From Swiss-Prot:
One of its GO terms (biological process) is cardiolipin metabolic process. Changing M104E: Failure to complement the mitochondrial defects of UPS1-deficient cells. Residues 1-80 are annotated as: Required for mitochondrial targeting. Changing V84E: Strongly impairs interaction with MDM35. Failure to complement the mitochondrial defects of UPS1-deficient cells. Interacts with MDM35. Found associated with a 170 kDa complex. Disruption phenotype: Cells show slow growth, fragmented mitochondria and have a 50-fold reduced level of s-MGM1. These defects can be complemented by human PRELI or bypassed by growth on a nonfermentable carbon source. Required for maintenance of normal mitochondrial morphology. Required for PCP1-dependent processing of MGM1. The UPS1:MDM35 complex mediates the transfer of phosphatidic acid (PA) between liposomes and probably functions as a PA transporter across the mitochondrion intermembrane space. Phosphatidic acid release requires dissociation of the UPS1:MDM35 complex. Phosphatidic acid import is required for cardiolipin (CL) synthesis in the mitochondrial inner membrane. With UPS2, controls the level of cardiolipin in mitochondria. This is Protein UPS1, mitochondrial. Belongs to the slowmo family. Its main location: mitochondrion. It is a peripheral membrane protein. Changing K58E: Failure to complement the mitochondrial defects of UPS1-deficient cells. The keyword Protein biosynthesis does not apply.
Length: 175
């Protein structure tokens, strides 16, 4: 069984601010678990889309019942692929863990789309959780992962809002 999760978040600002914040979101006070982020590749394709691949290293706290399977490892590598279409004010992102996939594989697909009617940017996310365990512990691992993901999404949105605010303050300094 694979566990699916969907969420929507509205950023009350323009697409340029949201996409700029996405690429500058680390570090922020809500993401101390992000240890490093490296850009692997970045280019503009023939259609004018900005394509970026980044590698992130994250740490995390695990429940005691999972620790024996990971032998004390509390860090993971994440691949992040993004495509920004400036002409349509859209950005599509895909992230997934590169290690521990036999225990849990988490894949996130997010589309950021500017809505001119509300002057806001809407982020629609779909997440797929799949565990390599047998039925007994499989649902427990997937449920824990989804719950943890929900907590992290809230922090991620607060982190993005923090970065958007800081970028706005830098753009319009108060005297």
């Amino acid at each position: 069984m694979v566990l699916l999760h969907k969420s929507t978040h509205i950023f009350p600002t323009d697409f340029a601010s949201v996409s700029r914040a996405f690429f500058n979101r680390y570090p922020n006070p809500y993401s101390p678990h992000v240890l490093s982020i490296d850009t692997i590749s970045r280019n503009v394709d023939q259609e004018g889309n900005l394509r970026t691949t980044r590698l992130l290293k994250k740490s995390g706290k695990l429940p005691t019942w999972v620790k024996p399977f990971l032998r004390g490892i509390t860090e993971t590598w994440i691949i992040e692929v993004s495509v920004v279409n400036p002409a349509n004010s859209t950005m599509k992102t895909y992230t997934r863990n590169l290690d521990h996939t036999g225990i849990m594989k988490v894949e996130e697909y997010t589309t950021y789309q500017f809505d001119s009617a509300t002057s806001s940017t809407i982020a629609d996310s779909r997440v797929k959780f799949s565990s390599g365990f047998n039925m007994g512990i499989k649902s427990k691992v997937e449920d824990w992962s989804r719950t943890k993901f929900d907590e992290n999404v809230k922090k991620s949105r607060m982190g993005m809002a923090f970065v958007i605010q800081k970028l706005e303050e830098a753009r319009n300094p108060q005297f």
